[in-house]
Amino acid sequence: MTGRVCVLVMDSFGIGASLDAARYGDVGANTLVHIYEACKRGECDIDGVRKGSLMLPNLASKGLYHAAMASSGLPFIDLSALAIPSGYYGYAVEQSLGKDTPSGHWEMAGVPVTFEWGYFPDKPYCFPEELISEFIKQCNLPGVLGEKHASGTIIIDELGEEHIRTGKPIVYTSADSVFQIAAHEEAFGLQRLYDICKIARNLVDKYQIGRVIARPFAGKPGSFKRTGNRKDYATPPPEKTLLDFLKEDGREVIAIGKIADIYAHQGVTQEIKADGNMALFDATLSAMKTAPQGSLVFTNFVDFDSSYGHRRDVAGYAHALEQFDARLPELEVLLQPNDMVFIAADHGCDPTFPGSDHTREHIPVLMFGPQVNSKFIGRRDCFADIGQSIAEHLQLSSPLAHGVSFL
């Protein structure tokens, strides 16, 4: 076996609108560049936290800005002032039809999503009457609240008090293929929320819905806060992913954060939960200290998307990027001679863009390790090139069905 692989997914960190962005209403989106420019204009200053230009020295040294320039062609930074990147760098184009978390992650692991997800229309009472009535019946509920497209933080402020008073869970959706259920951890019960999400998962299968998401919250009216006990109930990938093949080959597949949920807990040998980007980084470091040869450590950093991208918090996103960047040296010192680290994203979520939804963008593809030289890998025509490269490095007995290795 040849070394280990660590994959860090910066959830929603796009680096330029894709050629098909018009189909999604995302022409001009660019998560990285727009954050960079907002910082440069002084619009992302946070008293006592951050100020001025976006500072990502470690990601820059791995080729992030070179990849972003190649992706969009926008001359947002003087590349001649930067050192030659110390690893492989480029960008990837999504082949999956969606711009969502499962599509991006599954494609990255060798399974592009070539079918259309089901979506709920953006109108009041957006869910089919049959679905809601059966959900209420099977869960023994007095009813439901919401039934619309909404921001998760706004809808709990709007309906949280009524939810506590009536015992009716809040159901809502977004532009993604999701059925989301919010409930108060104490008043409704966390386990009860999980139980009704499992029922909902079975009910929405016929509608081709990608995920049912438990959105627990706590606190009192006027100060409700979502907790870290979110759970995603995903439909399983339609084919075996890289994770399945590694597990079948006797490898350790260590899923950190919501990775196990995204892959419907398939192909995973160990699940580690953590809340918040810094706790997720801590968990990644701990896993890398003990992960055996031939293993995969796979982490999703969800805060970029859920806390800053969807909420269109440009300054918060900038600060989160700088926090993430500052910790990369801690990971590098743990790498063994043949280890490789891959940094990528699953889609975009430009915090400067209208609305609150994901944006159809290219993703960065950065790869480094003790024995990795500098190489521009250019445009990758499928996220699955990442999975194929991992499969080659970990010496799987046969290649994945999709993707071209860039090793």
Curated annotation (Swiss-Prot):
GO biological process, one term: 2-deoxyribose 1-phosphate catabolic process
Cofactor binding, note field: Binds 2 manganese ions.
Compartments, as annotated in UniProt: Cytoplasm
Residue positions binding Mn(2+) 1: 11, 346-347
Pfam families assigned: Metalloenzyme
Entry keywords, A to Z: Cytoplasm, Isomerase, Manganese, Metal-binding
Enzyme class: isomerase
Gene Ontology cellular-component terms listed: cytosol
Catalytic activity: 2-deoxy-alpha-D-ribose 1-phosphate = 2-deoxy-D-ribose 5-phosphate; alpha-D-ribose 1-phosphate = D-ribose 5-phosphate
Entry annotated with the keyword Cytoplasm: yes
Cofactor: Mn(2+)
An MF annotation (GO) of this entry: manganese ion binding
Residue sites binding Mn(2+) 2 per the record: 305, 310, 358
Annotated metabolic or biological route of this protein: Carbohydrate degradation; 2-deoxy-D-ribose 1-phosphate degradation; D-glyceraldehyde 3-phosphate and acetaldehyde from 2-deoxy-alpha-D-ribose 1-phosphate: step 1/2
Annotated coiled-coil segments of the chain: none
Protein task: Isomerase that catalyzes the conversion of deoxy-ribose 1-phosphate (dRib-1-P) and ribose 1-phosphate (Rib-1-P) to deoxy-ribose 5-phosphate (dRib-5-P) and ribose 5-phosphate (Rib-5-P), respectively.
UniProt family annotation: Belongs to the phosphopentomutase family.
Protein name: Phosphopentomutase
